Amino acid sequence: MSVEADGRKLLRVEVKNSQTPIENKPHWIKTRATMGPEYRDMRRRMIDGDLHTVCQEAGCPNIFECWEDREATFLIGGDHCTRRCDFCQIESAKPEGYDKDEPRRVAESVKQMGLRYATVTSVCRDDLEDEGAWLCAETIRQIHQVTPGVGVEMLAQDFSGKQDLLDIVFEARPEVFGHNLETVPRIFKRIRPGFRYDRSLAVLDSAHEAGLITKSNLILGMGETREEISQAMRALHDANTDLLTITQYLRPNSYLHPIDRWVTPQEFDELAEEAREIGFVGVMSGPLVRSSYRAGRLYRQAMEARGERPVMIVTGYRDGAKPAPFAAKE
């Protein structure tokens, strides 16, 4: 190990990663940081509510766009993760105490913001007996209770593949259950040492068996080949995954995995077409797409494919205006 300036010990992989300078982004990756009034209001609400959002912790490039459109993804369980993935800037450390009031506060924030569709994700909590399953389930229940009719997407960890813990989350009935595969088998252990490729596929299949809409994500640019991407997409479809997002890896800092390549917008379009041909009912593919980007649209596509009506959005009125219904088509 080596030591960083602030005294934190660096892992060997972090030292190795840091030898590669941060890469310059191609012109199609760059975004303009426009902090409009809705963004500023959302940021104030996050601070006042003592909430964590994956938008902030993961350095999402869409934060200004999504918050300006009053879309947000909530990170629960704290801001430290018990596992380390080599693409994620959320700090890996022993988390602090268990905040049982967090589900209520998240639900109240969803109501105050007038959100139509909320995505909830969690850090890994291997330090807890239930690995955070109750916290995830209770957050789903609280959002449904406080804002009846709102769509809730749970982007979950794998809970070590323990069926009893997965069932706790499934029984809360999120509109969508997401678990991200992220990469291909050949480099999976290097990128996600705390997870297992086959176990992640089994988690998605289990959610399907529970009657939930399922969703996953693949990150490109970490060393995978084009054929490996196709194989991973087919594996996800074979595991009964309904929805798929395909994204470009953006390296948050020099201690994380170097970028292997920049995938062109044309290749993202080709992958989207291939995914639809494989049989996914909803696909988002692009350099700045993230797993929770336009999540409500993909949910509607899945419901249409099932011949069912999406939930109607009847959440909080804002500035005296009645929220529009969550229509079946964009």
From Swiss-Prot:
The record lists the catalysed reaction(s) as: [[Fe-S] cluster scaffold protein carrying a second [4Fe-4S](2+) cluster] + N(6)-octanoyl-L-lysyl-[protein] + 2 oxidized [2Fe-2S]-[ferredoxin] + 2 S-adenosyl-L-methionine + 4 H(+) = [[Fe-S] cluster scaffold protein] + N(6)-[(R)-dihydrolipoyl]-L-lysyl-[protein] + 4 Fe(3+) + 2 hydrogen sulfide + 2 5'-deoxyadenosine + 2 L-methionine + 2 reduced [2Fe-2S]-[ferredoxin]
Intracellular or extracellular location(s): Cytoplasm
* Chain ranges of the Radical SAM core domain: 67-281
Q: Where does [4Fe-4S] cluster 1 bind?
A: 55, 60, 66, 292
Q: Which UniProt keywords apply?
A: 4Fe-4S, Cytoplasm, Iron, Iron-sulfur, Metal-binding, S-adenosyl-L-methionine, Transferase
According to the record, cofactor stoichiometry and binding are noted as:
Binds 2 [4Fe-4S] clusters per subunit. One cluster is coordinated with 3 cysteines and an exchangeable S-adenosyl-L-methionine.
Q: Which residues bind [4Fe-4S] cluster 2?
A: 81, 85, 88
Provide any one GO MF term from the record: metal ion binding
Please give the positions of the paired cysteines in each disulfide bond.
none
One GO location term (cellular component): cytoplasm
Q: Which residues form the signal peptide?
A: none
Main localization category: cytoplasm
SMART domains named in the record? Elp3 (SM00729)
Q: Does the keyword tRNA processing apply?
A: no
For this protein, the record's InterPro entries field holds: Aldolase_TIM, Elp3/MiaA/NifB-like_rSAM, LIAS_N, Lipoyl_synth, rSAM
* EC code(s) of this entry: 2.8.1.8
Which pathway does the protein contribute to?
Protein modification; protein lipoylation via endogenous pathway; protein N(6)-(lipoyl)lysine from octanoyl-[acyl-carrier-protein]: step 2/2
Mind telling me which PANTHER family this protein's record contains? LIPOYL SYNTHASE, LIPOYL SYNTHASE, MITOCHONDRIAL
UniProt lists the family membership as follows:
Belongs to the radical SAM superfamily. Lipoyl synthase family.
Protein name per UniProt? Lipoyl synthase
